[in-house]
Amino acid sequence: MVGLSRLTGGGLLLVLALLPLALDGKPLEEAPTAPSRIIPFSRPVRKESQAVLDPMVHPERPAGSGDDGDLSRLEGLAKEALGDGCFGLKLDRIGTSSGLGCNPKRPDPAPTALARIIPFSRPVRKESRAALDRMQHPG
């Protein structure tokens, strides 16, 4: 066997390229594609699942052609489960209690620092009151 140090100058690539020929005497065949390997071993598909999978497998098929009864029935069930909210009944209940839903009820914004401090400050002269009013209500 040839030493590894002799293969470093590009000889290693040559050995790797010739390796399939040395093993069989013929080059390797192309490997089968992923779908052809997987599809024969997959289990049969039920009618309900087939109605959903058909548009994905055959996108060129128009939506209104053929047997769309199962698909429309499934769509109807899915729409019933949603309820009136955005995400479905359970999530909408969580959203309304946590305030994270589609239309959360937001409390009034917190008062500014001036509005919290001023009522507790000492009485103010007329000149200062005018300045404070301008700060509280600009514009």
UniProtKB/Swiss-Prot annotation:
One of its GO terms (cellular component) is extracellular region. It comes from the Eukaryota. Pfam families: ANP. The keyword Hydrolase does not apply. SMART domains: NAT_PEP. Keywords: Disulfide bond, Hypotensive agent, Secreted, Signal, Toxin, Vasoactive, Vasodilator. Natriuretic peptide that dose-dependently induces the rapid relaxation of rat aortic strips phenylephrine-precontracted. Acts by stimulating cGMP production in a dose-dependent manner (by probably activating NPR1 and/or NPR2). May also show potent hypotensive effects. GO terms for molecular function: hormone activity; toxin activity. Residues 26-75, 117-139 form a propeptide. InterPro entries: C_natriurtcpep, Natr_peptide, Natr_peptide_CS. It is found in: Secreted. Belongs to the natriuretic peptide family. This is Natriuretic peptide Mf-NP. Disulfide bonds join 86-102. Expressed by the venom gland. GO terms for biological process: regulation of blood pressure; vasodilation. Residues 1-25 form the signal peptide.
